[in-house]
Amino acid sequence: MENRTNFFHLHLISDSTGETLISAGRAASAQFRSAQPIEHVYPLIRNRKQLLPVLQAIDDAPGIVLYTIVDRELANLIDERCVEMGVASVNVLEPVMNAFQIYLGAPSRRRVGAQHVMNAGYFARIEALNFTMDHDDGQMPDDYNDADVVIIGISRTSKTPTSIYLANRGIKTANIPIVYGVPLPESLLAATKPLIVCLIATTDRISQVRENRVLGTTQGFDREHYTDRATISEELKYARSLCARHGWPLIDVTRRSIEETAAAIVALRPKLR
């Protein structure tokens, strides 16, 4: 019998760096060996304007929603919209805060990011997170020389979650999709400061993740082309040729966790440690 991994969308919404939430989500998902989350991480969500696109992304790719949002109005909006979408939502901190309030006999201050010491390291992480979110999926290409790391790769090679993981460690990270036959931005080729690294995986792995992506989204896809193994092999071949031409390192993420991939990237540039 085929031992097939089932993928699901895990949406993680935080009003701070998201580290607490990511740890909780991974601890829970690790208990289910046959299922693997496709993580969508949304840090620094602190107002309605920032939250609305996140809710749309959840509607496009339904799954499980975990959040650490102390603002009651935003938390209520998440819960209401998730009910409308038929999606499970969990306020991870609320049961803990309620237990503290009952035991201590005092209400919480509900201060955003209260668990973080406001030191230079914290502000560096916030700056890196802002940079990384602004430069996700090829956005703002003129700023690539301000990045510490630029991650490239074809679709479904964990570029965004790896970028956010690095940003949580104060590393400014941009990521760019490699699209077969489409040249990379000139601003990337001209960049001299950042470490540029390409993420790859096996054809079977990418096809499987893409199939689950298509099944779990309402967006329009040319499913046959997107998940076709021959097409993916050509995309990987194209990515490898770009890296060979420019001397960029490749990291195979097939059997690596996000943490292991990030560690492999940092190992390529010791000054990032």
Swiss-Prot record:
| Molecular function as annotated in GO | ADP binding; ATP binding; phosphotransferase activity, phosphate group as acceptor; protein serine/threonine kinase activity
The highest taxon in the source lineage is Bacteria
Nucleotide-binding among keywords: yes
Q: Which UniProt keywords apply?
A: Kinase, Nucleotide-binding, Serine/threonine-protein kinase, Transferase
- Catalytic activity from the UniProt record: N(tele)-phospho-L-histidyl/L-threonyl-[pyruvate, phosphate dikinase] + ADP = N(tele)-phospho-L-histidyl/O-phospho-L-threonyl-[pyruvate, phosphate dikinase] + AMP + H(+); N(tele)-phospho-L-histidyl/O-phospho-L-threonyl-[pyruvate, phosphate dikinase] + phosphate + H(+) = N(tele)-phospho-L-histidyl/L-threonyl-[pyruvate, phosphate dikinase] + diphosphate
Q: Where are the transmembrane segments?
A: none
Which InterPro entries does its entry note?
Kinase-pyrophosphorylase, PPDK_reg
Any Pfam family from its record, for instance, is Kinase-PPPase
Query: Which residue spans adopt a coiled-coil conformation according to this UniProt entry?
Result: none
Keyword Transferase found = yes
Q: What does this gene product do?
A: Bifunctional serine/threonine kinase and phosphorylase involved in the regulation of the pyruvate, phosphate dikinase (PPDK) by catalyzing its phosphorylation/dephosphorylation.
Q: What is this protein called?
A: Putative pyruvate, phosphate dikinase regulatory protein
